[in-house]
Structures are given as C-alpha cells and as structure tokens.
Amino acid sequence: TTMTDILKPVFNSMRKGNVRYSKGGLNPTGASCVITDEMGNDKLIGKCHRAVWYSKTGVPRTNLPDDQTFIKFAVGHAMEDNFQTHWNRMGVLIEGNIPLREDISNGDPRGELIISGEVDGLLRDFEMNEEGEITRISSTKAIGMEMKTNRGFFAKKEVYGIGNKRYPTGHPKMDHVMQTALYLRMRWKLEEYYGVEIDSFRIVYCQVDDGLTTYFDISLSDGYSGEVIIKDRNGDRIQPDALASLEAGLDLKRIGGLTIENIMDRYYMMQDYLQDVENPPPRNYQLRYDEETFEKKLAAGEISKTGAANWEKKPLAQVGDWQCRYCDWKNHCLPYGVLTEKVEAGLLTEEAALGQLGIVGFGS
C-alpha cells in the first residue's frame, strides 16, 4: 500500500488560495511610475502594464510558483500575524487587514480611478520608555502599517543596508513604496472611520533567514498628493551616501519624480489599455537587455560582473529585468524566450527559434 502524502493537499490548498472575488478597480500592487534615478536618467519602476492586463482580462497564469515559494509566502503571512498579535497585546493595534476601495481621482478630468487593496494594519501612535514599555497611547494620531518579509543576500544588502555603500541605512523596495503611497492617498477613509489623523505609513521588513528587522517611514509632501517622501528608521530622508558618490566618481542625486500624480498617470494609461480586451499593451521590461539598455545599466552599476559576462558571451542568456524573469505569464508573453521579439518581427521563423533554444518540434 502507498503511504498517504499528508503534505500534498496542503500545497494544493496553498495554490488555490482563498476564494478570490474581484472588488473591481485596479490594485496598489499594480502600481508603476517613471522616476529619475540617482544618475539623472528616466527609469520605469513597478508593474508591467502587460502583466496587469493579463491579470485583469483573466489570461491563465503559465508560470506558477513552486512548492518552496508557497512555503516562503506562508512564512511571510505567519510573521505578519505574529507582529499583529504583539501590537494588539500592547494595546496599540486599531485593526489589521483593512480592505480599502476608493476612487482616487479627486476631480481629475480623466474620470474616476478606482483602486482596491488591503492595508496590513493601523496602529495608535504612542510613547514608551527605554525598554519599549508603552507609557502613553494617543487617541487622535495613528500610523499605517505595511508588513513585508524577505530573505537572501540581495535583500540584506538592498533593504537592510548591509555592505551597501550607496544606502548604508538600507532602502525599501520601490514596489512597496508605491503601494504604500496609494494607501496614503486613500487614508482619509481610514481617518474618517476610525477618528484618527494619519501622517505616515511604515513599511516594516523582517528578514526571515537571519531575523533582521527594519522599517521605513513613507509620507506625502502635500496632504493626499505630491511627492512620496521616504525616511529611514532614524527619521532621515533617504538619499545616496555622499562618500559613495565621491568614491564612484558620480554625482548621485536623490531619486525624483516619485509622485502620486506620476503614479496616477500610469494607472490612467492602464485603464485605457483595458478598454481593448483583445490586444495586450506593449511589454514594459526585457527578458534580455538590448544593446542600448545593457550599456546604460552597465554604466549605472546595475548589472553584476557575472551578468555582464553572460550577456556578452551567451546570446540566449536571460540577462534582463527580474519583472520578466519571474513573471507569472512569462511563457504566454514570451513563448520563444529571448527570441520572441525576433519571431514577432518576422526576423526568425518559429521553427528556427525553437531550434536555437534547443526545443525540437515533433516530426522533424
């Protein structure tokens, strides 16, 4: 007799997730924005419009996470619940997992713009002693909360600043910053309902493999609009380290253009793309960088030595944007991998592309 595999149904349940019903509208996780990076170049950050289009038009995902990834997700959820338990025990948690659905257009001539998401938590502001014992809880001020877990060497460097010359106190992930900025835009709903004033949100990070934690403070420059302001846990506005600029011989500036208005522009574009349910919008990222992008990224120090060597030596190496590499619709969008655009442009037949990729068709 075969032994009952008691784990298999767990993964099946994880894959299915909770019953998902669309609350309508676009989601904060789908945010994107064109910013000016530290070098002064325009740079797109956030979700690819085509990926959002696939999601909203119901195109089935072709590249689902594996079992290990589901375990990583589960660890993340467990950490969120754990932190909430402690904030609750200390008497400062107003509420956790608060659904928000709001028209954020605020009279924009382009019409309504419905965004729906879920805020991880809302805490009452408080005072405490050296030990962290709470001495006073505010009845009027509150802090919004986004919880994120991560793991691995790159997160340690980027988010926590370990061995990071450019940002020694770390830097939050831009996708998380934009998501949080949208909750700040919509926060009047929370303020009204809970009778509090919310000046900022915190993104709390927990590195599950090493137990590191940190947080960043996110606020808007002009009430519910304007520039998105990112501060580290010391309360200092984040900008590239002056010494790192000098050492690199670069004049590194604080990133610009990260505003509610610019984020909204991309959402309005997305809304227009969704009027056409037959034709997906253009790809925003590259599975393999073209020559021009490669040179730019190399100069900006955004490509590792290994990556650069692979790009130069291996014409099929997927040295490009992580947004394509880890996309849920990768095989649907790029059926011929890095050769897809050549096939689409008629420069390569499907058979030739498959041959180069080492996939031999039947009967040949």
Protein language model features and the residues they cover:
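A residue-level signal for conserved active-site and pocket-lining positions in enzyme catalytic cores
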Residues: C48, Y183, C327
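Extracellular structured ligand-interaction cores
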Residues: S116-E118, A142, V177, I198-S200, ...
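Secondary-structure boundary elements
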Residues: R124-N129, R136-T140, R185-F201, D210
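Metal-dependent nuclease catalytic regions and adjoining charged, substrate-binding loops involved
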Residues: K157, G170-M174, K189-S364
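Short beta-strand-loop-alpha-helix junction that forms the active-site gateway
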Residues: M147-G170
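Metal-dependent nuclease catalytic cores that hydrolyze phosphodiester bonds in DNA/RNA
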Residues: T1-G144, R151-K157
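Short, well-structured alpha-helical interface segments that form or flank functional binding sites
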Residues: A78, N82, S116, D175-L182, ...
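Short, charged, amphipathic alpha-helix that recurs within catalytic cores of restriction-modification
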Residues: I162-K189
